[in-house]
Amino acid sequence: MNITAKTKKLGIIGFPVEHSFSPKMHNYISDKLGNDYIYTGFTVAPDSLGDAVRGIRALGMRGVNVTAPHKTEVMQYLDRVDPRAKRLGSVNTVVNDNGVLTGYNTDSDGFFAAPRHSGIEVRGKRVLVMGCGGVAKPTLMRMTEESP
């Protein structure tokens, strides 16, 4: 990986983030695909969240993932929030499009993409969700949105 001033910057913000596998995973995939991206973790204390979000724009970062405890509070610092994220009251992805910061909630995307990738359609099926972690609410909401 050759990092230059043109390398696109990505990351994850949370408190703490040292436990996250995201940097290792994203940098590995980026390197294998030949993308000019770098992804790093940023420990952001709750009282510094506004400064951190302004830093995304100021540094020209392409975007960040958002983890606990910032998924709700981050919304107040964004220019736009996707309708699904608004309904959930939770943002886990911030995209910087030429200085406009938009928040999304992509927590349920993997839940639906994995079976489809394997040729399994979950629409119209009975599904059991075990647990109530951060992905449960977005997944259940999306199931109700996509149910026939």
Question: What residue ranges belong to the model's regions?
Answer:
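Glycine-rich adenosine-cofactor-binding loop
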Residues: G14, G103-S108, R116, I120-P148
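Phosphate/diphosphate ligand-binding glycine-rich loop within oxidoreductases
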Residues: I3-S118
